[in-house]
Amino acid sequence: MHFHERFDVIVVGGGHAGTEAALASARMGSKTLLLTHNIDTLGQMSCNPAIGGIGKGHLVKEIDALGGAMAIATDYAGIQFRTLNSSKGPAVRATRAQADRALYRHKIQEILQHQPNLRIFQQAVDDLVVENETVVGVVTQMGLAFEAPAVVLTTGTFLSGKIHIGLENYSGGRAGDPPAIALAHRLQELPIRVGRLKTGTPPRIDANTIDFSKMTEQKGDDPLPVMSFIGDVNQHPEQVSCHITHTNERTHDIIRAGLDRSPMYSGVIEGIGPRYCPSIEDKINRFADKNSHQIFIEPEGLNTTEIYPNGISTSLPFDVQLNLVRSIKGMENAEIMRPGYAIEYDYFDPRDLKNSLETKTINGLFFAGQINGTTGYEEAGAQGLLAGMNASLQIQGKETWCPRRDQAYLGVLVDDLSTLGTKEPYRMFTSRAEYRLLLREDNADLRLTEKGRELGLVDDERWAKFSDKMESIETELQRLRSQWIHPRSPLVDVLNPHLKTPIAREATFEDLLRRPELDYPTLMSIDGFGPGIDDQRAAEQVQIQVKYSGYIQRQQDEIDKAIRHETTGLPLDLDYQEVPGLSNEVIAKMNEHKPETVGQASRISGMTPAAISILLVHLKKRGLLRKSA
């Protein structure tokens, strides 16, 4: 049975990757269908009730700069906002928000339902229709066939998902949801390498049974940050505190005594878990010398008593979970509302993807999110936006696009995955980016919004606000560069008390702002130097661009040198056996990875500068040298 309409792009799955993919495709004018097994769970925060953090906040800002929904929903649902690394340089500062699950889900669903060109339909997908190595549609559980020349799979943890609590296990996509067994079997028939990963979640605690007076209160920032570049602090709901407590030796003894009933330590779970978000069992085992681990007590919303104890993800049996929770200070009488669990699921080797997130072997088939081996809402959302955008570009007959490593954390993420692959759930950190001084949260819109507008992702409202901000920044920078102060000026007497060394020669206002003891608000508050610009985010940008101009230029020079051959394209059908001078090891790795560019090839383990030179000579001789889009 065929559905009565044909679509341009079909997105399968309604999590963070799927919603951003569907919205991106629809914003670009493609007739888009979002298929989900349950409309009520669109935008569900399946694990922790938080968005952002180190590296992750940068991705959220980039999604926002390209017109995505995640930051807007976070501003609407955020019940505590904090700027992490606020005492450090701007490159590593990151925004993190606790989010009310219900409010976040509601906002995402509202955005989806009001998006032109987007249809939502509730049905699980069981089959892909592939003809001549090209996807042409999908078939749902009830046998209904939908046709489209592009399909984006964002299946999360649902592919052959298996939930573990102690030595008991059962099939599930997440707690309360069925797995995608038929679709997993269908995907295993494709020429794409498959593996198993696992992730986990902690037990949820009833706040009424917690003694918060025994814990350390953790308040949000004041003044409050916003997540979206078009966000307003007045959009935030009521703000609440989190709390901090710790495990202790008794907790650790309880966990050790239960390890023989742990699915991870008894060999029941084969999937590899996330290195940077380990279970409490893993922490006790890997950090045996530590007698305490920090736990963040995070509220799940304003109208629920559920608490998320961040730091004790576990798949131990329920009785062990209850005992370990009650051994923790402030939770001696705690009641568990939902048990913690681990979930194993299929993922596909991201080295089998192009940097557009289209599979190399099936035309029109795109993957995004945990199916590619990543972990985290932010990583999923960023991939979803890219995949949905490229699916739309492709069916419009246009070149696909992916930012380079020096342009966005999204570029770093995709390059890492498609070049190196991953054996464990991949999460983003600022340390993964070579050019992080340029890839700051504060300038994500300056880096990406113009490109987003060109691609059709950015609407008129966002573009107008961005253009106003850019004009304010440029006008103010020109003013600071063109106005001078002389040592004999009356302004010197007002200025010198703010300086470590008095003014001794002519200087521009820009020169003054470069001084470490002066910041922009202080300089603007001195009579004769202001009033400056009112927009706080534009003012911050002025200060950063002035104070870090030397470092930024130095990093830009490094990029210009490195980029000469970074985007030189490599034919996907090139047989490296035919390239004279390459070692057998390099030939094997190049034929396995099939990198799309010389830049990707250079990052494959075992590649040498000499091998790259040989490759470039071969390409030039054969007339194959080309620049990637």
From Swiss-Prot:
SUPFAM superfamilies: FAD/NAD(P)-binding domain. The lineage of its organism: Bacteria, Pseudomonadati, Pseudomonadota, Gammaproteobacteria, Alteromonadales. This is tRNA uridine 5-carboxymethylaminomethyl modification enzyme MnmG. It comes from the Bacteria. InterPro entries: FAD/NAD-bd_sf, GIDA_C_N, MnmG, MnmG-rel, MnmG-rel_CS, MnmG_C, MnmG_C_subdom, MnmG_C_subdom_sf. NAD(+) binds at residues 273-287. Keywords: Cytoplasm, FAD, Flavoprotein, NAD, tRNA processing. NAD-binding protein involved in the addition of a carboxymethylaminomethyl (cmnm) group at the wobble position (U34) of certain tRNAs, forming tRNA-cmnm(5)s(2)U34. Homodimer. Heterotetramer of two MnmE and two MnmG subunits. It comes from Shewanella piezotolerans (strain WP3 / JCM 13877). Belongs to the MnmG family. One of its GO terms (biological process) is tRNA methylation.
